[in-house]
Amino acid sequence: MERADKDLAFLLRYENVAWFEDGEVRILDRRIYPAKVEFVTCRTHQEVARAITDMVTQSAGPYTAAPMGMALAAWECRGKSADEQMEYLKKAAYTISHARPTTQKRMTLLCDICLKEAERALSAGENVAEAIKNKTIELNNVRYNRMAKIGSYLVDMFPDNGTVMTHCFAETI
């Protein structure tokens, strides 16, 4: 799958925001970056929620950490029946989406997308954790491509010899 983070700065590459692999989610610790490059390793979806609460990931980072946490939750319950997996994932979705009050609305939306993807994957007999991870990459691609488009429009609005004094994610414009 083509990725919109190709050739972007370290801080924007998906693996350096939050990444599910081998039964854990690694989240770049933005509380100390760029002074140090360290990752917080979460081995349960509750630990992902705690990392979000504790501001390990910041700015748009929770919007990658939350669905990667859902992939981890799917991995945690992989041996259960389909109904039990969905029940487990619904509880995980609540825990993750309510980890930070300022991001709850959007994280609920993302967790709901993950629940739909889990239902689809279970019906198709696919690996639910991998399906949610791939959906997260797809969602990131959509967001990154949208922000690139917004950024290109914004650049055209700068006056000749203008100065940009601060930088934020384009979605805040």
What are these regions (language model features)?
Residues M1-A49:
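Positively charged, low-complexity intrinsically disordered leader regions
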Residues R50-A99, Q104-I173:
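N-terminal active-site beta-alpha-beta segment that forms phosphate/nucleotide-binding
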